[in-house]
Curated annotation (Swiss-Prot):
Signal peptide start-end: 1-26
Keyword Transcription: no
One GO location term (cellular component): outer membrane-bounded periplasmic space
Family that this chain belongs to: Belongs to the bacterial solute-binding protein 5 family.
Major localisation: periplasm
Assembly behavior: The complex is composed of two ATP-binding proteins (GsiA), two transmembrane proteins (GsiC and GsiD) and a solute-binding protein (GsiB).
Keyword Transport: yes
Molecular functions (GO terms): peptide transmembrane transporter activity
Protein origin, superkingdom: Bacteria
Alphabetized InterPro entries for the sequence: Peptide/Ni-bd (IPR030678), SBP_5 (IPR039424), SBP_5_CS (IPR023765), SBP_5_dom (IPR000914)
Organism placement in taxonomy: Bacteria, Pseudomonadati, Pseudomonadota, Gammaproteobacteria, Enterobacterales
Gene: gsiB
Function: Part of the ABC transporter complex GsiABCD involved in glutathione import. Binds glutathione.
Designated name of the protein: Glutathione-binding protein GsiB
Length: 512
């Protein structure tokens, strides 16, 4: 702050040589405009990718995923798995400290995994860790994690953004308020959180990786309106913005000071239908609604071409994803099916969205118009993060008002189980996880469970295909599109990326 005041004084005096020197040491402060607000800074208690992405400012895990969603070591050096698949032994890096000076060691890992795997803590990400039987600190750099049953995707759970290492001293000090007081091993530490406006983080001078971070601060600013985010880039109010309004992508691409990036994605957009409620308990109704939506037109209208029509319930870039013949747009067929289902004049329903940004609202409007053409009157509501948490994620089947729900999912572990189980397994109805269709099929449950007990790729392929075949046939969803991730940044900002799961990679970020 003193540096900035000193610089402005020199400008006022008009001392050119001093001005040049001060510019050379100008603070590297970056503003990132994002599409919605943050729910918490505790990764274990965040259901949304954005909150977990911002938490990466402070936190790191034992493992992580690179830009290709491949596993990489972070705070861990290596791991081994026992022959029975029940025990994971992890070797840790030495000499790392948390931002409060506490040592990072095996005891810290145990404290975090004990907290995460204890149902009494009621953490939203508990389901990721409920298979942990016990965690033991063998010595300061060795952790042994024993599972209740074999879980072949467990190492990907340890790479999930939720599996952050929090200072055990901070956990002891702040308890349930840790979401407001993040203390990790990451490159930045908390400066300010104005819960209605921004999160600002500043360089952690004791960061363990030499020469990093290169930025002095990052301000994460929620901006719901797509056009405002784009305008902030053009005026220099922000140096990075995501998501970029698709209709403005071409305009931004012409700006010589801005670089536009369209990245591969594992973000699947869909509409779930509550199959426990009429009329969505009728398979013919669900089939009709799939015929009622013109997906190629939706790609153009809402996504300006930056998406592809969905060909399954798992994005193609996820291992073991199955592709099917896309649903054709056939409103005549849709009306015939509705008549056979006992709804010759259609019906009225509600369609909620998990987000309220401009693209989500376009999807709602487009879908509302498409449904109207087959006699379905849908009242639409675009929710903010607080509404979504209260009305969708926080209510069970009996209390839920969810009927049709437009949302998206990215399997942040990079593997098939997390692309399927949270969304279709019977035990994962809200408020447990995100099966907002309240879908239940015993065969699907069995196939998903069996797939986690084998490390044989051929057997996994068979089991995941069998599960997806049933889900596709029973249609608890209207699969819509797989997005392309469109972001933009100032050309002098380097090393700042969007991950395929819509998270951020910014450890090497710098302002030139």
């Amino acid at each position: 702050m003193a540096r900035a005041v000193h610089r402005s004084g020199l400008v006022a005096l008009g001392i050119a040589t001093a001005l040049m020197a001060s510019c050379a040491f100008a603070a590297k402060n970056v503003v990132v405009a994002v599409g919605s607000n943050f729910t918490t800074l505790d990764p274990y208690d965040a259901n949304d990718t954005l909150s977990q992405a911002v938490a990466k400012s402070f936190y790191q895990g034992l493992f992580g995923l690179d830009k290709e969603m491949k596993l990489k070591n972070v705070l861990a050096e290596s791991y081994t798995v026992s022959d029975d698949g029940l025990t994971y032994t992890v070797k840790l890096r030495e000499g790392i400290k948390f931002q409060d000076g506490t040592d990072f060691n095996a005891a810290a890992v145990k404290a975090n995994l004990d907290r995460a795997s204890d149902p009494a803590n009621h953490l939203k990400r508990y389901n990721l860790y409920k298979n942990i039987a016990k965690t033991e600190a063998i010595d300061p750099t060795t952790v042994k994690i024993t599972l209740k049953q074999p879980f072949s995707a467990f190492i990907n759970i340890l790479a999930h953004p939720a599996t952050a290492m929090i200072s055990p001293a901070a956990l002891e000090k702040y308890g349930k308020e840790i979401g407001f007081h993040p203390v990790g091993t990451g490159p930045y530490e908390l400066d300010t959180w104005n819960q209605t406006d921004f999160v600002k983080v500043k360089k952690f001078v004791g960061y363990w990786q030499p020469g990093l971070p290169k930025l002095d601060s990052i301000t994460w600013r929620p901006v719901a309106d797509n056009n405002t985010r784009a305008a902030m880039l053009q005026t220099g109010e922000a140096q990075f913005a995501f998501p970029i309004p698709y209709e403005q992508a071409a305009l931004l691409e012409k700006n010589k000071n801005i670089e536009l990036m369209a990245s591969p994605s594992i973000m699947q957009r869909y509409i779930s239908m509550n199959v426990t409620q009429k009329p969505f308990d009728n398979p013919k109704v669900r089939e009709a609604l799939n015929y009622a939506i013109n997906r190629p037109a939706l790609v153009k209208v809402a996504f300006a071409g930056y998406a592809t029509p969905a060909t399954g319930v798992v994005p193609p870039s996820i291992a073991y994803a199955q592709s099917y013949k896309p649903w054709p747009y056939d409103p005549v067929k849709a009306r015939e099916l509705l008549k056979k289902a006992g709804y010759p004049n259609g019906f009225s329903t509600t369609l909620w969205s998990s987000h309220n940004h401009s693209t989500a609202q376009k999807v709602l409007q487009f879908t509302q118009q498409q449904l109207a053409q087959v006699g379905i009157k849908a009242q639409v509501t675009a929710m903010d993060a607080g509404q979504r948490a209260a009305e969708v994620e926080g209510k069970g089947q009996k209390e839920s008002g969810v009927r049709m729900f437009y949302t998206g999912w990215s399997a942040s572990t990079g593997e098939a189980d997390w692309a399927l189980s949270p969304l279709f397994a019977s035990q994962n109805w809200p408020p447990t996880l995100f099966n907002t269709a309240f879908y239940s099929n015993k065969q699907v449950d069995d196939f998903l469970a069996q797939a986690l007990k084998t490390n044989d790729p051929a057997e996994k392929t068979r089991l995941y295909k069998a599960a997806q075949d049933i889900i596709w046939q029973e249609s608890p969803w209207i699969p819509l599109v797989v997005e392309k991730l469109v972001s933009a940044h100032s050309k002098n900002l380097t090393g700042f990326w969007i991950m395929p799961d819509t998270g951020f990679s910014f450890e090497d970020a710098d302002l030139q």
